A protein has these predicted regions:
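Acidic helix-start/capping segments at beta-turn-to-alpha-helix junctions
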Residues: 90-92
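Short, surface-exposed acidic-centric catalytic microdomains
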Residues: 29-55
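N-terminal accessory alpha/beta regions
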Residues: 98-99
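Long, amphipathic alpha-helical surface segments
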Residues: 1-20, 26-27, 35-39, 60-68, ...
Length: 157
């Protein structure tokens, strides 16, 4: 997997950073860097660091939650995507980003994309990523992720 600080930087680019609770486009109560507190509640352990999140959190608190969410997504990708560990760091990141955004079960619905990646057809996998409701909803994020899948290089443009 890519370095934690790089994953944080990229996910802040894609998700944004909000220190007060807000409703995400899907209508869920969210805070920090895309932490959906309805489906992924703040744990007691996390509350010790972030405090009363309903009143807002610090940037450090948001990054703490994000690190936990990145580790969770990475663990789920390793568990549910058999070939994940064989991918280079950038393509692992692409799947991690999608898992972070969609949840592992949302990512697993991309069967054709995942199959293409498993057999090394990264151009085909990229096309499958872009030919989806996900791509229409997240726009430039999906373009970056698809390009990363195809080329094995992440670009901030």
């Amino acid at each position: 997997m890519i370095e934690m600080q790089e994953a944080i930087k990229r996910l802040i680019l894609h998700e944004g950073l909000k220190l007060k609770p807000y409703k995400c486009p899907a209508g869920y109560l969210t805070i920090g860097v895309g932490r959906n507190v309805e489906t992924n509640p703040i744990t007691e352990e996390e509350k010790k660091v972030v405090g009363d999140w309903e009143r807002g959190i610090t940037e450090n608190g948001a990054k703490y939650l994000l690190k936990n969410d990145i580790m969770k997504a990475h663990k789920e990708c390793k568990k549910y995507i058999e070939f994940y560990k064989t991918l280079d760091d950038e393509r692992q990141y692409a799947l991690l980003d999608m898992c972070f955004n969609l949840g592992i079960y949302g990512l697993l619905k991309f069967r054709k994309m995942l199959f293409a990646m498993e057999i090394g057809d990264y151009r085909g996998a990229s096309k499958e990523c872009l030919n989806s409701k996900y791509a229409k909803e997240v726009g430039k994020r999906a373009v970056r992720i698809a390009r990363t899948i195809e080329k094995g290089v992440f670009s901030y443009d």
